[in-house]
Amino acid sequence: MIKFSNVSKAYHGATQPALQGLNFHLPVGSMTYLVGHSGAGKSTLLKLIMGMEKANAGQIWFNGHDITRLSKYEIPFLRRQIGMVHQDYRLLTDRTVVENVALPLIIAGMHPKDANTRAMASLDRVGLRNKAHYLPPQISGGEQQRVDIARAIVHKPQLLLADEPTGNLDDELSLGIFNLFEEFNRLGMTVLIATHDINLIQQKPKPCLVLEQGYLRY
């Protein structure tokens, strides 16, 4: 599914690389934690997989294709195979929950009626069909995070990435979010979760990639 071969990334003006010489492989159907303190390089690694950043060295393979060589016209096709869950939700506050979830499909060219049907099915999977016509400010933080997850999976991605998805939630809500990720993984989705929530990792043990100052330690 995903393979990093000696991947490095440095930002202009930075005193040290964000990522240095990374080598790892995530097989199809795996669920893995990406662990590290703030600034360790977790978000940068996820952005490289999404094609939002370019590596300075090395190769990143996704389903047998080197994504470091993709053109700007090919990147959108890559992103349709990947879902991304954010810590800060990034929901449009003037659009209803179902409109937020359907929007990526409409942007990709799907008819709004079909996109709405798919969005409702995605909300079903996260238990929020009953909040479909609410605005994001009218629902709780935990529910907004579930909306972001519904949006991330609405296009049925092969790979789901999550960047600190429980950073703003209490332990009980965090556990519920991780249960959703486990459910998607059981259904065949490959999942990579960037987190520093050690307590939750201990409750839900999975293979870990540990980043420290841009280096992969384990």
UniProtKB/Swiss-Prot annotation:
Residue sites binding ATP per the record: 36-43
List the GO molecular function terms.
ATP binding; ATP hydrolysis activity; transmembrane transporter activity
Q: By its UniProt entry, which PROSITE patterns does this protein fall under?
A: ABC_TRANSPORTER_1, ABC_TRANSPORTER_2
- Keyword Membrane tagged: yes
UniProt cross-references to Pfam families, sorted A to Z:
ABC_tran (PF00005)
Q: Report the subcellular localization.
A: Cell inner membrane
Identify the Gene3D superfamilies for this entry: P-loop containing nucleotide triphosphate hydrolases (3.40.50.300)
Q: List the GO terms this entry assigns under cellular component, sorted alphabetically.
A: plasma membrane
Membrane disposition = Peripheral membrane protein
Q: Where is the ABC transporter domain?
A: 2-218
Q: Which SMART domains match?
A: AAA
In terms of superkingdom, the source organism counts as: Bacteria
Gene Ontology process terms (BP):
cell division; transmembrane transport
- Cite the NCBIfam families for this sequence: FtsE (TIGR02673)
Family membership: Belongs to the ABC transporter superfamily.
Tell me, how does this one assemble? Homodimer. Forms a membrane-associated complex with FtsX.
Instruction: Give the protein's recorded name.
Output: Cell division ATP-binding protein FtsE
Ranked from the top, the taxonomy reads: Bacteria, Pseudomonadati, Pseudomonadota, Gammaproteobacteria, Pasteurellales
